């Protein structure tokens, strides 16, 4: 068995062979420009490389590969390009100024470098220069190095020199990045030097030095800014530092402001303002834009405008970075570009540019995307993206690797033998990219469907194609060669194998074959069946092979015919198969051989335009018929070309009768027959002879400028243009032109001459050739026109002042030539004096001469000789220096010492001749210059000198002379200077010490002797120390300023009672003199600083305590110990304090005797000296020992039944210990039996049962302590009764309780039957049943409870018990303790930092004072501080206060109940006042030309330290103040840099804590020569109209002043009006702020059964009130200080329902809308002030000028007359209409004289009361018995100042004063009282306060009140509304007043009335409340408005809506 297998592979393209690790890369991708000097040449390495080694080539930008030019250009084998040095005549633009690139190629591909511009720089001469500059002293100067533009790009400034000395950038000299020289803070000496710049050529290395320039320095003069350095545009790359220069000259120093794109530029971070301008660090493209530098001062502005271009370096990035694909796939590349916009992007593959085509697409913005479809193997390699913009370029590359995608057979079927009917499955597994298509054949015939074969395929996960061929039942005919063919775009692969099916062998019929001559042909024998023996081939019965071209493969039956030949190989071929040895079969096939055409090659010869063309195409062989066609450039030839084609058999000819350029192209002849189609191609090039497009013409060239000689030609090939030159105008002899940097041929063929010279004049020939036809040429003549040029002139020349000077210059050029002379920027005219210009022609030259007669200093400078003709101009600069004697130097004092003066001078104008020396003169100020000391010929190199051996503190005058070779200068300005002081040589005199306190010593002394002071004594140093015999202690030094010849100082904060030694030294500016002799003194004695320590107390008996302590150290005693004081007091059980006692002793122990038994004592110990008591020790507590108790204070016994009695008792008055129990004894006499019963210590009654009826028993009680039984009580007798009468076991007595607590009054009654109990309260001597309500109730055991006890609950309560057999009664006196009364606070002493307050305590409220709270606040501040104070103290000193400041103080006492009323607010001021300048001191110590020394010693601090000091000055007539850099006040201050000979205004402001003071002054600086300037005088200039400018200005100023004055007056009136109102309300604000503080502190919990909170209490203090109180029968004027009491109450519905039973009544229907709390204080004790603001409701806002009215109700008692208490001060009789006055009680220290107006805050002159005054008056009223139950009506209104006099007089008629005047201050227009309600007539009188008494007759009333009372006695029913203003009227249209409407009383008032006799009871009739009169139609509104919860209820405003007949009233008691 044998196997036949054949594998063929076919490829459609040639590919590169890949190395396994090949790559390409760049070694210097940034190389883009190479510039070199022509004299040095350069080497340029190729920036590309690769692995394996690459082939490097260089190309021009046009793509032409460069070649070696011997001696000029060479490419080394390593790829380095070398340009050799060359002379200028060999310069070639093609080589020396061109763009190159190089390529690197290896098997990976080919990459191309970026374009590299190679440029040679020719050496050419150049000069740099610097121009003179001008500036002002103290300003900035800028020198610039001017470089010719032709070399500016290559030449840089490397340094600057100042008189041959190199300058280094430092503090004053700065060299910028652009090469400019900045000189900062220019001084006069800077003008003495020459300045030049040094440059270096970047490529040739040549250096150049500029000419010398001078700096002219002038004195500062007011001027607008002028730009010294700026910029037009700047270009930079991102990341670089950019400097934008902007510097200007101006005075004052201008301000710089930068803008970018017209927006202010924030100078921070990367943007920094420097001396030179703007510095931008790390520039960014966003920084590009327009920049404006605005420079301005008060005299003008200037601008620098320029643009900045910041370019981002171009960067190209290709993605993806790695591309590996397969043949036939698609590859996409993207090129991202960063950098500038609008760049040009192009793609390259293997160094060749890519253009869009069939399979290449370039898309995206700016062609950024490259897409290639159907990649073939040749598409692999290096891809590059190039980006170009201007001269910048960037590239990136990526290698694209294409894998072989040709199909490959992975696995396939093999040859096999099968039996018939056996199934067969053939598999072919193929891979390839793209996926291949698999087809099947059998013996070269395609297998079709339905032939018994099934074909299927699948794609595996690996991407392989698996094709199946299945035969379900094989047959013999299915045998043969099976072939699977895989085909894709990359290629095709075949696999075949034979499948033999057993059966008889045979041959399938074979098709005839056509073979192509010259190629190979295969013939297959298609055998089927198996097995067989052999296969043989025959041709014409001849067994094959019979030659070398025939090969027979017996194993597979294939015959191969190589290089088929028609004559030999064509014919019949037979295949014979031997089936069996004797059996064979055969089959024949005919082979036909076809011969393809063969075209004889042809080529187009060289044709020129217009010629005729004939080209034949001959097919020399090939089978006929043959078809011949022609194509041009791959397309059929169009008929429009005029081409004729003739075809004859096997030939074809192409004919063109008239050749033109359009016939250029590739022509192809194509021959076709049945065998094949062949073609031959040849290129036709039409050559065009040259001809001129632009012919040269004669033209003119101007010397020194560029000229272009035009010449342009065309032709094909492109013609070459060559220029030749013949010098001169003679017969032309043309010679080639040597091209160089000056002469170049442009790309269009024109000749460029950059700088025309005279030698360029002549004939120029333009020759054009291209080897086609004859060359053409044309000549032209260039005429060189010479512009005017200065050929000869002196650069510098000298002249002597006053002499004649001539200067000449020679000009050359085309005539006519005009020569003119200029001085600086001024043209010299013939009519100008002293100048004479003459001109003459000498040959081709013109000579001009300038004569100056005579020369003066102003002639120094630059003269220019300016020559002008029609072709140009030139200028020669001549520096004329006029020499003269120098100007005097400007001298100043460099240093002044006590013995030397160092001068420094600045040389002014040197006379343009070097200074040869200086002369210095010095004299005493008072001497003449004739006696001056002289120093001559000081070296000119010096600019300072020192004068020695002068006297300290003496005044000298100094001047100088300068000399040069011309002469001597005038004397300089005279400087007067005082030598520095030396330290004093003598001590202060008459030093005395005087101790002034325990911690201070007063030191007095006098200045040292005059001749020893060595200057002005500025101050003193006081040295002090604690004196000791050793004397080793170091002195403490205090420095003080001097105030005169006699000095005084007080040393503070010394140790008390200590011996001190003290010395004094005088000081001046030079130092400190010797000290005085040490003097010894001792500080005064003081109280001890510390309390005794280790205080111990031990109770030794029930009545004694032993106390011991440690004595004090000497340091703590502060004096001589006089003894110790022991203070002690008993702490009683009820919390009260016993009497405070003290005992003195000299020993450190003491025994206290006679103490209360078993009592807790507080003990303190202090030491005292002769100065007083020291600090008390901390309290210690010790209790005396127990003893037997005293007898019970009382015993009661009563029968409860026939066999039982009750015993009750009171505790002993002297408990003497803890009661352990009580023993009750009961005995009867017959027989005597004593029974003992024990009761617990907390029970006070005992029931004794089982007694005998009708038998008397004796009962007594004994208390028992741990010490034993005490004394027995009295023995009482009791008898048990069956009918036991009612008896009360409770004892009568006094019950004391704090207010706002629940109190239970016991009443335990016994009897049989059980008695009934009732409680009564005594009211004005008449008992009445107690009221049972929510607050009062009676328990079932008979006890009476009062919840939240109030002051009015005080009084006598009686409990009555009765039954059928008797009754009993007890009386309990209930005393309610209340907060204490206000203390009376005064100021006793003030200092600069402390205020000592003293006070007298008020009533303690029934409970001893526990302490005080002192509040204080700084004036105009609402922040209050507080201090707790001991109850025994009566004064307090506040330390560390501000000096010279007003303070407010209040004091509050506290007892066991709580804090009481605050005292009135008093004010005091610490010592001190605002600073002031002493009139005896001179402000200006010294004045010269530019400096002023101020003497600040004259400032007196006013006793308070200086806190701030401000000093400002400005030149007279200017508006801008200059603030001196000064923050503290010292002895002197110097103002620098002033303008000479100028008047100045000066103002100072000095402040301390007491205030500020200002001082203004004018001064004038001296002239340059030291003289004074005239005083200020207004100049007068007469105008044409006769009116002076000054007069016009006066009129304008006068009108302006009048207008401003009127405006200021109006504003002042508004301010005064506002301040008056603020001052009137200031006191109320003080009370408000204090109330706010107290409201936050005084919250406490009420001890009620329900644990309700107590209300907050607010005290409103009023210093004074004047009140008119009306009654029906009496009227009193009360004047005193009082406080109104306010507490809160709930005015909800519940309160309204209880209005008949409680003491507050609301007479306003909409009271719930009130804006503040409605307050019920009926339970308050007079003089206290609880309040809260809960349940406050908002209401309508009050309107101005509306009256508000409050009615205050309180029941009036009917009691007998009493006298007034001592707290009341009745006014003395006075005249009618007068007003009581009382001196203000505020304490004012002696330092307060200047603020005397502050001591009274409330006017006592006005009858109009403030709300505070009303509150005080009301309190006094309610404390008066006969007014306690009166109803008060308060009417509020707004009054004016004009109406106060009428109100004070108390007019009885209505006036218009209230309605017509301007509203001013809120006040009280009316205050009336109404009778009490009848049911309130019997209210409680037993208050726990002193009773108020009233006078019994009219004697004590003021006369006007008595008169008013008598006048109204007869009208009991008339409303008492005739007093004090009577009403507040709302201003309306009409002024007619109606009789006031009288409001009806409230329903409660009208429901009852009382009457009695005048002797026993006060008679009251029902009256009405006086209210506001109204006009018709007027709406008078009134509603309560509470401004805040802390303000008084009386400080309210409101309005009543509608015609409500009721006034709003509040019940306040």
Swiss-Prot record:
SUPFAM superfamilies: Fibronectin type III, Immunoglobulin. Residues 20-119, 125-216, 225-305, 313-401, 407-500, 504-592, 596-685, 690-783, 787-883, 1285-1377 form the Ig-like C2-type domain. Residues 1718-1809, 1920-2013 are annotated as: Disordered. Residues 18-1594 are extracellular. Residues 1616-2013 are annotated as: Required for netrin-mediated axon repulsion of neuronal growth cones. Residues 885-982, 987-1086, 1091-1187, 1191-1285, 1379-1473, 1474-1575 form the Fibronectin type-III domain. Expressed in cortical and cerebellar neurons, in cells of the external and internal granular layer and of the Purkinje cell layer (at protein level). In the retina, expressed in dopaminergic and Nos1-positive amacrine cells and most retinal ganglion cells (at protein level). Expressed in the brain with highest levels in the cortex, olfactory bulb, hippocampus, thalamus, cerebellum and spinal cord. Expressed in the retinal ganglion layer (RGL). Phosphorylated at tyrosine residues. Phosphorylation is enhanced by NTN1. It is found in: Cell membrane; Cell projection, Axon; Synapse; Cell projection, Dendrite. It is a single-pass type I membrane protein. Residues 1616-2013 are cytoplasmic. InterPro entries: DSCAM/DSCAML_C, FN3_dom, FN3_sf, Ig-like_dom, Ig-like_dom_sf, Ig-like_fold, Ig_I-set, Ig_sub. The keyword Disulfide bond applies. Pfam families: fn3, FN3_DSCAM-DSCAML_C, I-set, Ig_3. Homodimer; mediates homophilic interactions to promote cell adhesion. Interacts with DCC; the interaction is abolished in response to NTN1. Interacts (via extracellular domain) with NTN1. Interacts (via extracellular domain) with UNC5C (via Ig-like C2-type domain). Interacts with PTK2. Interacts with FYN. This is Cell adhesion molecule DSCAM. The gene is Dscam.
């Amino acid at each position: 068995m044998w196997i036949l297998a054949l594998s063929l592979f076919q490829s459609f393209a040639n590919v590169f062979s890949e190395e396994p690790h090949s790559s390409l890369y760049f070694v210097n991708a940034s190389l883009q420009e190479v510039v070199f000097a022509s004299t040095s040449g350069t080497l340029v390495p190729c920036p590309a490389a690769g692995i394996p080694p690459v082939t490097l080539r260089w190309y021009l930008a046009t793509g032409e590969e460069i070649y070696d030019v011997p001696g000029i250009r060479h490419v080394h084998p390593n790829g380095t390009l070398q340009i050799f040095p060359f002379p200028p005549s060999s310069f070639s633009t093609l080589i020396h100024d061109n763009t190159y690139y190089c390529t690197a190629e290896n098997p990976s591909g080919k990459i191309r470098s970026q374009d590299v511009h190679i440029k040679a720089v020719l050496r050419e001469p150049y000069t740099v220069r610097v121009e003179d500059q001008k500036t002002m002293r103290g300003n900035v100067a800028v020198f610039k190095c001017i470089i010719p533009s032709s070399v500016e790009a290559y030449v840089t400034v490397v340094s600057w020199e100042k008189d041959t000395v190199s300058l280094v950038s430092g503090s004053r000299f700065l060299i910028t990045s652009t090469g400019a020289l900045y000189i900062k803070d220019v001084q006069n000496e800077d003008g003495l030097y020459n300045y030049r710049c040094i440059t270096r050529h970047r490529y040739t290395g040549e250096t150049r030095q500029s000419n010398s320039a001078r700096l002219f320095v002038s004195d500062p003069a007011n001027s607008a800014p002028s730009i010294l350095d700026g910029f037009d545009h700047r270009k930079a790359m991102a990341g670089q530092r950019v400097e934008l220069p902007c510097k200007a000259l101006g005075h004052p120093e201008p301000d710089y402001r930068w803008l970018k794109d017209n927006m202010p530029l924030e100078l921070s971070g990367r943007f920094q303002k420097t001396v030179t301008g703007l510095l931008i660090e790390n520039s960014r493209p966003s920084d590009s834009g327009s920049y404006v530098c605005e420079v301005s001062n008060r005299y003008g502005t200037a601008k620098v405008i320029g643009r900045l271009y910041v370019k981002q370096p171009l960067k190209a990035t290709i993605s993806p970075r790695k591309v590996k694909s397969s043949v036939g796939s698609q590859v996409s590349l993207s090129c991202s570009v960063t950098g500038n916009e609008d760049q040009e992007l192009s793609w390259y593959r293997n160094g060749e540019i890519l253009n869009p085509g069939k399979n290449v697409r370039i898309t995206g913005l700016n062609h950024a995307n490259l897409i290639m479809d159907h990649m073939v193997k040749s598409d692999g390699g290096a891809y590059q993206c190039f980006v170009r913009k201007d001269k910048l370029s960037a590239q990136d590359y990526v290698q694209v690797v294409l894998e072989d995608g040709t199909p490959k057979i992975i696995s396939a079927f093999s040859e096999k033998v099968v039996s018939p009917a056996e199934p067969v499955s053939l598999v072919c597994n193929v891979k390839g990219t793209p996926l291949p298509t698999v087809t099947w054949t059998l013996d070269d015939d395609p297998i079709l469907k339905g032939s018994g074969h099934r074909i299927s395929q699948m794609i595996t996960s690996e991407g392989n194609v698996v094709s199946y061929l299945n035969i379900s039942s094989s047959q013999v005919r299915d045998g043969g060669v099976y072939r699977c063919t895989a085909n894709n775009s990359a290629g095709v692969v075949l696999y075949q194998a034979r499948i033999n099916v057993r059966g008889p062998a045979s041959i399938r019929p074979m098709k005839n074959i056509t073979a192509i001559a010259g190629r190979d042909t295969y013939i297959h024998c298609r055998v089927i069946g198996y097995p067989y023996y052999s296969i043989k081939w025959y041709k014409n019965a001849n067994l094959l092979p019979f030659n070398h071209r025939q090969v027979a493969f017996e194993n597979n039956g294939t015959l191969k015919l190589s290089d088929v030949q028609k004559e030999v190989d064509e014919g019949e071929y037979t295949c014979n198969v031997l089936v069996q040895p004797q059996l064979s079969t055969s089959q024949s096939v005919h082979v036909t051989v076809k011969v393809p055409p063969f075209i004889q090659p042809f080529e187009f010869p060289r044709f020129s335009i217009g010629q005729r063309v004939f080209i034949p195409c001959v097919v020399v062989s090939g089978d006929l018929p043959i078809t011949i066609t022609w194509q041009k450039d791959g397309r059929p030839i169009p008929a429009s070309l005029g081409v004729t084609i003739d075809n004859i058999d096997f030939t074809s000819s192409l004919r063109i009768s008239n050749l033109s350029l359009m016939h250029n192209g590739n022509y192809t002849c194509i021959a076709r027959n049945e065998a094949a189609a062949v073609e031959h191609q040849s290129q036709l090039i039409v050559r065009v002879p040259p001809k001129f497009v632009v012919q040269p013409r004669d033209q003119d060239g101007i010397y020194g400028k560029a000229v272009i000689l035009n010449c342009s030609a065309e032709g094909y090939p492109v013609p070459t243009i060559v220029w030749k030159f013949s010098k001169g105008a003679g017969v032309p002899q043309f010679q080639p032109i040597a091209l160089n940097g000056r002469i170049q041929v442009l790309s269009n063929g024109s000749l460029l001459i950059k700088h025309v010279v005279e030698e360029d004049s002549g004939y120029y020939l333009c020759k054009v050739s291209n080897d086609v036809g004859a060359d053409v040429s044309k000549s032209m003549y260039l005429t060189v026109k010479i512009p005017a040029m200065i050929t000869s002139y002196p650069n510098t020349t000298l002249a002597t002042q006053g002499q004649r000077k001539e200067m000449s210059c020679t000009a050359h050029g085309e005539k006519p030539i005009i020569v003119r002379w200029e001085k600086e920027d001024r043209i010299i005219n013939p009519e100008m004096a002293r100048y004479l210009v003459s001109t003459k022609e000498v040959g081709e030259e013109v000579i001009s001469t300038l004569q100056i007669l005579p020369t003066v200093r102003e002639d120094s400078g630059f003269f220019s000789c300016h020559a002008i003709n029609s072709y140009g101009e030139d200028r020669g600069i001549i520096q004329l220096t006029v020499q003269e004697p120098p100007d005097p130097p400007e001298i100043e004092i460099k240093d002044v010492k006590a013995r030397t003066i160092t001068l420094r001078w600045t040389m002014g104008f040197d006379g343009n001749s070097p200074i040869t020396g200086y002369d210095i003169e010095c004299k005493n100020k008072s001497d003449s210059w004739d006696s001056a000391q002289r120093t001559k010929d000081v070296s000119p190199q010096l600019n300072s000198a020192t004068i020695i051996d002068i006297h300290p503190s003496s005044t000298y005058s100094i001047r100088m002379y300068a000399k040069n070779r011309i002469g001597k200068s005038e004397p300089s300005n005279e400087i007067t200077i005082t030598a520095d002081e030396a330290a004093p040589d003598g001590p202060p005199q008459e030093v005395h010490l005087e101790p002034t306190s325990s911690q201070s010593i007063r030191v007095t002394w006098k200045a040292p002797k005059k001749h020893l002071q060595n200057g002005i004594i500025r101050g003193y140093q006081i040295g002090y120390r604690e004196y000791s015999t050793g004397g080793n202690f170091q002195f403490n030094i205090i420095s003080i300023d001097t105030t005169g010849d006699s000095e005084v100082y007080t040393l503070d904060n010394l140790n008390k009672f200590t011996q001190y030694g003290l010395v004094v030294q005088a000081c001046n500016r030079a130092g400190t003199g010797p000290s005085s002799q040490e003097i010894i003194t001792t500080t005064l004695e003081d109280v001890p600083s510390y309390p005794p320590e280790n205080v111990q107390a031990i109770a030794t008996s029930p009545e004694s305590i032993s106390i011991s302590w440690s004595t004090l150290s000497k340091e703590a005693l502060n004096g001589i110990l006089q003894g110790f004081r022991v203070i002690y007091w008993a702490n009683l059980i009820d919390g009260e304090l016993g009497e405070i006692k003290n005992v003195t002793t000299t020993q450190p122990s003491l025994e206290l005797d006679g103490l209360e038994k078993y009592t807790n004592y507080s003990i303190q110990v202090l030491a005292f000296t002769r100065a007083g008591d020291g600090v008390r020790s901390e309290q210690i507590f010790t209790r005396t020992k127990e003893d037997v108790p005293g007898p019970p204070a009382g015993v009661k016994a009563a029968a409860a039944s026939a066999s039982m009695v009750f015993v009750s008792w009171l505790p002993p008055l002297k408990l003497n210990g803890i009661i352990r129990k009580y023993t009750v004894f009961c005995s009867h006499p017959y027989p005597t039996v004593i029974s003992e019963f024990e009761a617990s210590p907390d029970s006070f009654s005992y029931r004794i049962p089982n007694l005998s009826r009708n038998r008397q028993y004796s009962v007594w009680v004994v208390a028992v302590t741990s010490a034993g039984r005490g004394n027995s009580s009295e023995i009482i007798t009791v008898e048990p009764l069956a009918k036991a009468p009612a008896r009360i076991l409770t004892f009568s007595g006094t019950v004391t309780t704090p207010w706002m607590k629940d109190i239970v009054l016991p009443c335990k009654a016994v009897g049989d039957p059980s008695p009934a109990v009732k409680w009564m309260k005594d009211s004005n001597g008449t008992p009445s049943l107690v009221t049972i309500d929510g607050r009062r109730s009676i328990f079932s055991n008979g006890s009476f409870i009062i919840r939240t006890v109030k002051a009015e609950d005080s009084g006598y309560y009686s409990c009555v018990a009765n039954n059928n057999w008797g009754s009993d009664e007890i009386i309990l006196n209930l005393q309610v303790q209340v907060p204490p009364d206000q203390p009376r606070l005064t100021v006793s002493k003030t200092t600069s930092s402390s205020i000592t307050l003293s006070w007298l305590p008020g009533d303690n409220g029934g409970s001893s004072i526990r302490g005080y709270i002192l509040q204080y606040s700084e004036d105009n501040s609402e922040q209050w501080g507080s201090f707790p104070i001991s109850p025994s103290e009566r004064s307090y000193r506040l330390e560390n206060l501000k000096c010279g400041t007003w303070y407010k103080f209040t004091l509050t006492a506290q007892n066991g109940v709580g804090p009481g009323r605050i005292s009135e607010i008093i004010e005091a001021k610490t010592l001190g006042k605002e600073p002031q300048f002493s009139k005896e001191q001179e402000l200006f110590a010294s004045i010269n030309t530019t400096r002023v020394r101020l003497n600040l010693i004259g400032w007196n601090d006013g006793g308070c330290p200086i806190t701030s000091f401000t000093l400002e000055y400005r030149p007279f007539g200017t508006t801008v103040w200059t603030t001196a850099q000064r923050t503290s006040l010292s002895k002197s201050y110097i103002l620098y840099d002033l303008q000479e000979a100028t008047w100045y205004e000066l103002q100072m402001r000095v402040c301390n804590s007491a205030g500020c003071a200002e001082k203004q002054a004018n001064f004038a600086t001296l002239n340059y020569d030291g003289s004074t300037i005239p005083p200020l005088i207004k100049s007068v200039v007469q105008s044409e109209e006769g009116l002076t400018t000054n007069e016009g200005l006066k009129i304008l100023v006068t009108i302006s002043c009048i207008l401003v004055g009127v405006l200021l007056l109006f504003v002042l009136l508004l301010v005064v009006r506002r301040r008056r109102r603020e001052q009137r309300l200031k006191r109320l604000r003080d009370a408000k702020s204090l109330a706010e503080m107290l409201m936050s502190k005084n919250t406490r919990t009420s001890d009620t059964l329900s644990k309700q909170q107590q209300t907050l209490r607010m005290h409103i203090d009023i210093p004074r009130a004047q009140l008119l109180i009306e009654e029906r029968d009496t009227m009193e004027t009360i004047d005193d200080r009082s406080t109104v009491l306010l507490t809160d109450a709930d005015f909800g519905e519940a309160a309204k329902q209880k209005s008949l039973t409680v003491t507050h009544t609301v007479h306003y229907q909409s009271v719930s809308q009130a804006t503040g709390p409605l307050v019920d204080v009926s339970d308050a004790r007079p003089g206290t002030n609880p309040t809260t603001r809960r349940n406050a409701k908002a209401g309508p806002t009050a309107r101005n000028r509306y009256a508000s009215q409050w009615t205050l109700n309180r029941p009036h008692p009917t009691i007998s007359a009493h006298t007034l208490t001592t707290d009341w001060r009745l006014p003395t009789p006075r005249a009618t209409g007068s007003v009581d006055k009382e001196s203000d009680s505020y304490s004012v220290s002696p330092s307060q004289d200047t603020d005397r107006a502050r001591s009274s805050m409330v006017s006592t002159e006005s009858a109009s009361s403030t709300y505070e005054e009303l509150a005080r008056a009301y309190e006094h009223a309610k404390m008066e018995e006969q007014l306690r139950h009166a109803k008060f009506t308060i009417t509020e209104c707004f009054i004016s100042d004009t109406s106060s006099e009428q109100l004070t007089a108390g007019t009885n008629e209505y006036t218009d004063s209230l309605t017509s005047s301007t509203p001013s201050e809120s006040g009280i227009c009316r205050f009336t009282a109404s009778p009490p309600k009848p049911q309130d007539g019997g209210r409680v009188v037993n208050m726990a306060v002193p009773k108020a008494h009233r006078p019994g007759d009219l004697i004590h009333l003021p006369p006007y009140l008595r008169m008013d009372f008598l006048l109204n006695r007869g009208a009991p029913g008339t409303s008492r509304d005739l007093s004090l203003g009577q009403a507040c009227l709302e201003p309306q249209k009409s002024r007619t007043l109606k009789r006031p409407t009288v409001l009806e009383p409230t329903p409660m008032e009208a429901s009852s009335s009382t009457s009695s006799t005048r002797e026993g009871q006060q008679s009251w009739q029902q009256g009405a409340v006086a209210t506001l009169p109204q006009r018709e139609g007027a709406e008078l509104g009134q509603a309560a408005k509470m401004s805040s919860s802390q303000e008084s209820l009386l400080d309210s405003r409101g309005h009543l809506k509608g015609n409500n007949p009721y006034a709003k009233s509040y019940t306040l008691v």
